UniProtKB/Swiss-Prot annotation:
Pfam family for this entry, one: KOW
Protein family: Belongs to the universal ribosomal protein uL24 family.
Function: One of two assembly initiator proteins, it binds directly to the 5'-end of the 23S rRNA, where it nucleates assembly of the 50S subunit.
Gene name of this polypeptide: rplX
Protein name: Large ribosomal subunit protein uL24
SUPFAM superfamilies on file: Translation proteins SH3-like domain (SSF50104)
GO BP term, pick one: translation
GO cellular component: ribonucleoprotein complex; ribosome
GO molecular function: rRNA binding; structural constituent of ribosome
Keywords in alphabetical order: Ribonucleoprotein, Ribosomal protein, RNA-binding, rRNA-binding
UniProt subunit comment: Part of the 50S ribosomal subunit.
PANTHER family xrefs: MITOCHONDRIAL RIBOSOMAL PROTEIN L24
Native organism taxonomy: Bacteria, Pseudomonadati, Thermodesulfobacteriota, Desulfuromonadia, Desulfuromonadales
InterPro entries found in the cross-reference section: KOW (IPR005824), Rib_uL2_dom2 (IPR014722), Ribosomal_uL24 (IPR003256), Ribosomal_uL24_CS (IPR005825), Ribosomal_uL24_KOW (IPR041988), Translation_prot_SH3-like_sf (IPR008991)
Length: 109
């Protein structure tokens, strides 16, 4: 399966717009473009029962973040602090940058 074009990147602040975590914000820890999913810090936490192994000698119940579908998150603009859609703009030097469609502010520094 081909990797999907992602509208968010690692370390972006996002807001969940659908699902049980709707309305919560967090920072993206990992992007999985092959599956079209993102892992957001301290959101969508699940419990996994693990056996003792070399890494985790104790075993037991471990809480970790599960991936969310990328379509369920919206990038939060740093200027207007609102979830927004993004556009791509080509600068004079030929580099591409993302911008907020609500306040027209550049998102990539």
């Amino acid at each position: 399966m081909a990797a999907k074009k992602m509208h968010v990147k690692k370390d972006d602040m996002v807001m969940v717009i659908a699902g049980k975590e709707k309305g919560k914000t967090g920072k993206i820890m990992r992007v999985l473009p092959g599956k079209g999913r993102v892992v957001v810090e301290n959101l969508n936490v699940v419990k996994r029962h693990t056996r003792p192994n070399r890494v985790n000698t104790q075993g037991g119940i471990v809480e970790k973040e599960a991936p969310l579908d990328a379509s369920n998150v919206a990038l939060v603009c740093s200027a207007c602090n609102k979830p927004t859609r993004t556009g791509v703009r080509v600068l004079e030097d030929g580099t591409k940058t993302r911008f907020c469609k609500k306040c027209n502010e550049t998102l990539d520094k």
